[in-house]
Amino acid sequence: MSLFGFFKNKGSATTATDRLKLILAKERTLNLPYMEEMRKEIIAVIQKYTKSSDIHFKTLDSNQSVETIEVEIILPK
């Protein structure tokens, strides 16, 4: 990849996909009471900008100290 290609605009589909990928990680040892509230707020913001109600949270591979959550958003056509 050349230096000039680095600044080239991505296609809109690629940009949209990148923006919709969201990974949350929390430490299991900390019992954070605001995680569920934060999850609800994230859903509200996503719905505000995408008008989508098809939002799923998935727990990905976790180790003992970190749990990773992926947010999947199905956009309406």
Swiss-Prot record:
The transmembrane segments are none
What UniProt keywords are attached to this protein's entry?
Cell cycle, Cell division
Is Transmembrane helix a UniProt keyword of this protein? no
Q: Which SUPFAM superfamilies match?
A: Cell division protein MinE topological specificity domain
Pfam families for the chain: MinE
Coiled-coil blocks:
none
Q: Does the keyword Cell cycle apply?
A: yes
GO BP annotations of the record are: cell division; regulation of division septum assembly
**Similarity field:** Belongs to the MinE family.
Tell me the function of this protein. Answer: Prevents the cell division inhibition by proteins MinC and MinD at internal division sites while permitting inhibition at polar sites. This ensures cell division at the proper site by restricting the formation of a division septum at the midpoint of the long axis of the cell.
Q: Which HAMAP family match?
A: MinE
Q: What is this protein called?
A: Cell division topological specificity factor
**Organism of derivation:** Helicobacter pylori (strain HPAG1)
